[in-house]
């Protein structure tokens, strides 16, 4: 069998996979390229690579595809269509517009994409207007926390999506303390394990460093950055049209119940914070921002687009003409 191509980031991530594949001590992760990157994706890669019959490297990456397809099929559980043909059509269409062979070349974006899609499926059963449902909240937080072990930005997504989930519950501050404590304890646990077992915990870029302080005082430079980021946002939305579907869904959803309205409000706030986070990341980065935007922002945006997919399914569920005629 010919080996599917490893792309640029894949050559960094495979080094982590090789540490696990060769049964090396986990501390050896500090000596590979980009040691500050989280390693769970590399462990999964190595596990399925080592336990495959032929032990081809790309067999480990096949799990990423399996995880992705499985997450897409969670649509079945919430779609209230009378016609199975429509369900299959929707699932097939989602795969067509979200499948990117390039990202299966060793990139970790699909792990974030699939994790958020599965988490959002569980969030649809949360009733924000009742007392906090601890068991459901803890399950969702557990699912979301895995993102921290896939990519650096996973921690910030965990804070955005998990924090909002707790904050918007119709409960007292006292009742929200426990899940908030669990969330921050989970973040601290990841920090502690990486710092004290692997030996390193840091991000790929410095936050609000001296270079950023210099730039922030230059209004014209910041404006040029914002314009460039916005331009590449539009390019990314065209490249991954699921975002276009998400935005139109947010704009045109109507005739929804109180429970659905709360879910929609949660998604809207998450969307705003999600977008602001991306702007903040690229405004903060001191590197050649035009080049950086051209090679990264599409992937950064793609990995969170799945979270808002259920708004589109909600619209289809409400459209009886569509759901009953196919």
Put a short name on every predicted segment.
Residues 102-111:
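Short acidic/glycine- and proline-prone juxtamembrane loop motifs at membrane-interface regions
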Residues 2-16, 22-44, 55:
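Extracytoplasmic catalytic/substrate-binding loops of multi-pass membrane glycan-assembly enzymes
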Residues 68-80, 166, 238-268, 310-312, ...:
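Hydrophobic, aromatic-rich transmembrane alpha-helices
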């Amino acid at each position: 069998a010919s080996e599917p191509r490893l792309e640029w980031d894949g050559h960094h991530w495979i080094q982590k996979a090789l540490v696990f594949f060769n049964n090396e001590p986990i501390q050896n992760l500090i000596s590979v390229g980009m040691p500050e990157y989280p390693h769970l994706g590399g462990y999964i890669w190595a596990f399925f690579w080592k336990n495959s019959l032929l032990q081809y490297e790309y067999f480990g990456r096949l799990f990423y595809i399996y995880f992705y397809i499985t997450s897409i099929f969670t649509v079945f559980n919430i779609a209230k269509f009378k016609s199975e043909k429509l369900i299959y059509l929707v699932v097939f269409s989602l795969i067509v517009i979200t499948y990117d062979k390039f990202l299966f070349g060793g990139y970790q974006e699909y792990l974030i994409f699939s994790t958020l899609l599965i988490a959002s499926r569980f969030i649809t059963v949360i009733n924000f207007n009742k007392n906090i449902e601890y068991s459901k909240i803890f399950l969702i937080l557990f699912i979301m926390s895995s993102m921290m072990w896939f990519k650096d930005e996973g921690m910030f997504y965990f804070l955005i999506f998990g924090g909002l989930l707790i904050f918007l519950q119709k409960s007292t501050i006292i009742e929200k303390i426990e899940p908030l404590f669990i969330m921050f304890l989970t973040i601290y646990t990841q920090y502690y394990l990486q710092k004290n077992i692997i030996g390193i915990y840091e991000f790929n870029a410095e936050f609000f460093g001296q270079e950023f302080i210099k730039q922030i005082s230059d209004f014209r430079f910041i404006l040029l950055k914002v314009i460039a980021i916005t331009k590449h946002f539009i390019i990314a939305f065209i490249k991954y049209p699921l975002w276009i579907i998400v935005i139109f869904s947010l704009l045109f959803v109507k005739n929804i119940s109180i429970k659905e309205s709360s879910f929609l409000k949660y998604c809207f706030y998450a969307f705003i914070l999600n977008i602001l986070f991306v702007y903040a990341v690229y405004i903060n980065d001191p590197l050649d921002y035009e080049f950086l935007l051209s090679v990264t922002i599409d992937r950064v945006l793609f990995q969170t687009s799945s979270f808002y997919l259920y708004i589109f399914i909600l619209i289809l569920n409400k459209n009886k003409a569509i759901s009953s005629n196919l």
